[in-house]
Structures are given as structure tokens and as C-alpha cells.
């Protein structure tokens, strides 16, 4: 069976890197490539709409004004899952541009399908490693905000190094934010919430908007996600953090 464009995307979510002597350089990933298959519908959505809703990884910064056709602030969301809440936010905020990153191709296909259904035009999606996109494809000072909702908690202590929220990640994000740009995170794992708070609070370029110096109630503009609903059913709390760049 001939592989389509959508089938190929899963194989190119990150670029290979090698040591000086030519050996493959292993990376500490914050994600796992799941083996879920694209449905025929999701595949068709990706193949038919990538030209208008998709972006490919590149080694030079994106020209957001050209991509979106305006100078509205760009909000980046990393790990949007199936994309429903991301599309809903884009639909509700036409004065903002949204850029979503997800390595799971069925999620990318589902997000595109829902965006087409809603008629959303201020959204683009990428199927690639977010750390490489931040490093290579986004210029400093060009993001209005970052959203990171319910990232993989890597709950075992030996796997905490795989959590995406680390000091070097936050430093990288801050470089990409414009003045007064925001970082909004949410998790239903208390231990991860504590780590997020510690890492974000330690960076002197950020200000916590919480009146108590820790977490905020879920704001109305963040849709209730299936992960949050799942957490409620399991008796988990949910913690939102909202910091602003000085």
C-alpha cells in the first residue's frame, strides 16, 4: 500500500542528530510515539487540508504575519491531544492566532477535522517535536503565549527527567515570548503541579498572577478537557498556573 503524506508525518516528528564520530545521538524525550493508527477519515483530513491548516518543521523562523495574514498575537499550545479544546479556543478568540504541536498523528487528524467543521482559520498545526520547533522554527520575542495543558506526568520518580517542564525548557520558552507574553499550564497530578510551580517561580523573568503565589482557578477561557473530566472522576484535583513575562 502506498503511504500518503499523512502516513509519512509520524516518521518525521524529530530530526536525527549524530555525534562528531557519526554515532546516533539518543535524546531524552518528553513524549512517547504511540502506535495508534490514523482512521481513513483522519488521513483524508490531513491530506486534504495540510496546505491551509498544517505547517512543517523548518530550520528558519516562521513568518507568522505571512502564515496567518495578520499581526495578531500567536499562542502556542504543545501537546493538544485530539485538539478539541484548542479548536474551541481558536474559534472563541478570532483576534488571536493559534499554533498547535502534537506528535500523535491521529490527534493531528482529529484536530484538523474539527477545525474544518468549525470553520476555524486562525489555527495551524505541526506534527513534530516541540523542542525542535522552539529551537529552530520560532524567532525570539514572537509568541504571545504558551499553553501546556495536561502534559505527560511521567509519574515514576526515575522518569521525572522526561517531564517537559524543566528549567531549560522554561528559559527557551521565555526567549520566544514577547513582552507580557504568558505561560499557562495545567495538570491533574499534584506532584507535577508542584514541580511546575517551583520551576516557573525560580525564573526571575516571570511573574506569577496567582494572588496566593501558587495556583489559579481554571479560567473561563480554558475549555474543560477530557483529561480534566477524567481527573475529576478519579478524584484528582486540577492545578492551573499562569505566569507573565516581565
Curated annotation (Swiss-Prot):
Belongs to the class I-like SAM-binding methyltransferase superfamily. TrmB family. S-adenosyl-L-methionine binds at residues 77, 102, 129, 152. The active site is at residue 152. Pathway: tRNA modification; N(7)-methylguanine-tRNA biosynthesis. It comes from the Bacteria. One of its GO terms (cellular component) is tRNA methyltransferase complex. The keyword tRNA processing applies. Keywords: Methyltransferase, S-adenosyl-L-methionine, Transferase, tRNA processing. The gene is trmB. One of its GO terms (molecular function) is tRNA (guanine(46)-N7)-methyltransferase activity. Catalyzes the formation of N(7)-methylguanine at position 46 (m7G46) in tRNA. Its EC number is 2.1.1.33. It is an enzyme of class 2 (transferase). Transmembrane segments: none annotated. HAMAP family: tRNA_methyltr_TrmB (MF_01057). Substrate binds at residues 156, 188, 225-228. This is tRNA (guanine-N(7)-)-methyltransferase. It catalyses: guanosine(46) in tRNA + S-adenosyl-L-methionine = N(7)-methylguanosine(46) in tRNA + S-adenosyl-L-homocysteine. Pfam families: Methyltransf_4.
Amino acid at each position: 500500500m502506498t503511504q500518503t503524506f499523512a502516513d509519512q508525518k509520524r516518521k518525521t516528528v524529530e530530526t536525527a542528530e549524530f555525534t562528531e564520530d557519526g554515532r546516533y545521538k539518543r535524546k531524552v524525550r518528553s513524549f512517547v510515539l504511540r502506535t495508534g493508527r490514523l482512521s481513513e477519515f483522519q488521513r483524508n483530513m490531513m491530506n486534504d487540508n495540510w496546505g491551509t491548516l498544517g505547517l512543517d518543521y523548518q530550520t528558519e523562523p516562521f513568518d507568522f504575519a505571512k502564515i496567518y495574514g495578520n499581526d495578531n498575537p500567536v499562542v502556542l499550545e504543545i501537546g493538544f491531544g485530539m485538539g478539541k479544546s484548542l479548536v474551541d479556543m481558536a474559534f472563541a478568540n478570532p483576534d488571536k492566532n493559534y499554533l498547535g504541536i502534537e506528535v500523535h498523528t491521529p490527534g493531528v487528524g482529529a484536530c484538523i477535522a474539527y477545525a474544518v467543521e468549525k470553520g476555524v482559520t486562525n489555527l495551524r498545526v505541526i506534527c513534530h517535536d516541540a523542542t525542535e520547533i522552539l529551537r529552530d522554527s520560532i524567532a525570539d520575542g514572537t509568541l504571545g503565549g504558551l499553553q501546556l495543558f495536561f502534559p505527560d506526568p511521567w509519574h515514576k520518580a526515575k522518569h521525572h527527567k522526561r517531564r517537559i517542564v524543566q528549567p531549560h525548557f522554561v528559559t527557551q520558552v521565555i526567549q520566544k515570548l514577547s513582552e507580557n507574553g504568558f505561560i499557562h499550564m495545567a495538570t491533574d497530578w499534584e506532584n507535577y503541579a508542584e514541580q511546575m510551580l517551583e520551576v516557573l517561580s525560580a525564573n526571575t523573568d516571570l511573574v506569577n498572577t496567582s494572588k496566593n503565589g501558587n495556583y489559579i482557578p481554571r479560567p473561563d477561557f480554558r475549555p474543560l478537557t477530557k483529561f480534566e473530566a477524567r481527573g475529576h472522576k478519579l478524584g484528582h484535583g486540577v492545578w492551573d498556573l499562569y505566569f507573565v513575562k516581565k
